[in-house]
Amino acid sequence: MKFDKYEYLQDLMRRRGFAWGSFEIYGGARGFYDYGPLGATIKRKIEKKIREAFIREGFFEIETPDITPEQVFIASGHVEKFVDPLVECKKCGARFRADHLIEETLGIDVEGKSAEEMTKIIREHNIRCPECGGELSDVWYFNLMFETYIGPYKDKKAYLRPETAQGIFVNFKRLNAFARNKLPFGVFQIGKAYRNEISPRQGMIRLREFTQAEVEIFFNPNETEHPHFDEVKDEVLRLYPIEHQLKDLGMIELTAEEAVKKGYVMNTFFAYYMVMIKRILLDIGIPEDKIRFRQQLPEERAHYSADTWDAEIYSERFGWVECVGLAYRTDYDLSRHMKMSGADLTVMIHYDKPKIVKKLNVTLNMKKVGPKLKEKVKEINEKLKSMSQEELRKLVEELNANGKVIIEGHELEKEDLIIKEVEEKIQGEKIVPHVLEPSFGIDRPFYLLLENSLTVDEDGRVYLKIKKDMAPIEVAVLPLVAKEPLTTIAYEIYRNLQKEGFIVVYDEKDSIGKRYMRYDEIGTPYCVTVDNQTPEDGTVTIRDRDTREQIRVKIEEVPRKLKELIFG
């Protein structure tokens, strides 16, 4: 019988304290998972690796609320566009995600199709309810954000955040001041996000509450060469670009430098952070041959993205699973928040030398329009002052073409306006920064780290070959038998290792063979065994989880040796 890694891992996670479905005693709730003692430890280690990598890049961390006022998500586009297609059974009332139902029934990809198009496909192929066989409704869109209210008033609508990013964008003015108005700079946040998935399945792969680590890198769109790209240019990336997906050409492997030169990746700024993502996943313990970058098709991309590459990890059960997104969000978010809030979210870019530029200057001809516009003059003047150079150029073009324009509801002719082209010396310009966003999920890499670590030896031993510094229990101290003086010596070693900062357990129950199996199964890289030789010469054995080989070490050298073995 073939070993079912998924089923074994699900059992292992529940049985040994890694993770399990939430609210078990009340029948559970799909899309929610609890982390047990071992799982929570690994999850924290993943977060620590990501946090340390971000800090090494010079990014700084903030923390913002999970509950966010509705205005923020109106501005960000989530109220309008953060939706999935939904369909309901007219007979039993069961609801399903329409695109998934069509794909599972017909094997066709309907990503990007409208609700009307999906309804037509359902009707043409007579797709029925998977639960009861009943007729399905027309497809409509369901917003994935959890809705709530701030305080006792229904007019203070809010949402649980679907991403941590907006908390960074709305704080841009303060963050830019903290960064001393100097681009580029990065800000990250690690925290919970919430998406009210229609039908979450696949265990920990699709959750309604999950943890993200997102960094927003603010940069000048005219400066897209990363200053440290030379340090990473030779790193090999496995890519699956759009062209290769459409033509079924498979993946390609090439260096970061080649990826930019051949046009697969837009610039060295983008490529640099692809390498950063890959290195973080390797540091967590994901095997290199299980990592690839897939470029999202245009219809897959989020409403804010101009280009997105997903770092995917391979799963025996689920295939390639998206775990990290690298999205070019352009100036979408900051521009939207500027418009909605009225706040100035620009950055002043100072030139090395002053520039002479030609500018359009459009004002009202007061002699001509003053008598007829009267109190409206101020309003129209303010509108003209607020217009960008591009808007003024369009206004003049329209005036030349039609002989008139409408401003603030008032029709104005050529003679009503004074149009001049003036030269101006400028020291710099205000820009809305663009954003590149590496966005890590934590829960999916957690599960896929366990799946890719689960190993079966030739003799049938099942153990977790997790990267040693990612193990939830780093050391087990075991007396060979539960007798003095072995137990006292073992316990003293255990206490000393605790003080040295190891995650360590003491265990004297069952035979030594059973205990080795117990700790192999949860990935403990080393067992320190106090045996009958220990009282005679002050040495113990350190057993390696993967090879099962043992070395003898003096008790006083155990902490140093374990640090060397586990952390390098």
Swiss-Prot record:
List the EC numbers from the record: 6.1.1.14
Keywords from UniProt, A to Z, are: Aminoacyl-tRNA synthetase, ATP-binding, Cytoplasm, Ligase, Nucleotide-binding, Protein biosynthesis
| Gene Ontology CC annotations of this record | cytoplasm
Q: Does the keyword Ribonucleoprotein apply?
A: no
- The highest taxon in the source lineage is Archaea
Q: Which sites bind substrate?
A: R97, E163, F210, T211, Q212, A213, E214, E437, P438, S439, F440, G441
Binding locations of ATP:
195-197, 205-210, 322-323, 441-444
Listed GO MF terms:
ATP binding; glycine-tRNA ligase activity; protein dimerization activity
Q: List the catalysed reactions.
A: tRNA(Gly) + glycine + ATP = glycyl-tRNA(Gly) + AMP + diphosphate
Q: Which PROSITE patterns match?
A: AA_TRNA_LIGASE_II
- Where found? Cytoplasm
Keyword Chaperone present in the record's keywords: the answer is no
UniProt xrefs under CDD domains: GlyRS-like_core, GlyRS_anticodon
Question: Which GO BP annotation is one of this protein's?
Answer: glycyl-tRNA aminoacylation
Q: Which Pfam families match?
A: HGTP_anticodon, tRNA-synt_2b
- Its biological purpose: Catalyzes the attachment of glycine to tRNA(Gly).
What family does this belong to? Belongs to the class-II aminoacyl-tRNA synthetase family.
**PANTHER family from the xrefs?**
GLYCINE--TRNA LIGASE, GLYCYL-TRNA SYNTHETASE/DNA POLYMERASE SUBUNIT GAMMA-2
Please report the name of this protein according to its UniProt entry. Answer: Glycine--tRNA ligase
Q: Which organism is it from?
A: Pyrococcus furiosus (strain ATCC 43587 / DSM 3638 / JCM 8422 / Vc1)
